[in-house]
Amino acid sequence: MKILVLHGPNLNMLGTREPEIYGSLTLDDINAALSQLALDLGIEIECFQTNSEGRLVDRIQSAAGLFDGILINPAAYTHTSIAIRDAIAAAALPAVEVHLSNIHNREKFRTKSYIAPMAIGQICGFGADSYLLGLRAIFNHIKK
């Protein structure tokens, strides 16, 4: 089993960007924890971060046939990107949407997700653990 892990805009700034909201772990820390969990589960992951909406769409489109599922934190694109939503729908792979913070308990403009209707589930509000819970969720879903 191989899972594509996608990190959206500004996640490269984790550890220094608003740690009171997003925590003190860096993206490298999160990727290392995901890699360890993947090893424990006996699966492969490939992690990719970009600040570009188009590059995220390209990676999602190229995932079909190469990956069994997608774990995605679309970050700010959650609330704006119909293009990412449509790419996930077209890829026809199971996807889990994750967020470090609880997007439903933040500013009103952050509460709507264009991605969630295309995902098998959404996990948010657990900091870096949202990613680990998301990886376990997609693993269990595909394994069924």
Swiss-Prot record:
This is 3-dehydroquinate dehydratase. Pfam families: DHquinase_II (PF01220). Transmembrane segments: none annotated. One of its GO terms (biological process) is chorismate biosynthetic process. The record marks R17 as: Transition state stabilizer. The gene is aroQ. It comes from the Bacteria. Keywords: Amino-acid biosynthesis, Aromatic amino acid biosynthesis, Lyase. The keyword Nucleotide-binding does not apply. Pathway: Metabolic intermediate biosynthesis; chorismate biosynthesis; chorismate from D-erythrose 4-phosphate and phosphoenolpyruvate: step 3/7. It is an enzyme of class 4 (lyase). InterPro entries: DHquinase_II, DHquinase_II_CS, DHquinase_II_sf. It catalyses: 3-dehydroquinate = 3-dehydroshikimate + H2O. Homododecamer. Belongs to the type-II 3-dehydroquinase family. Catalyzes a trans-dehydration via an enolate intermediate. Substrate binds at N73, H79, D86, L100, S101, R110.
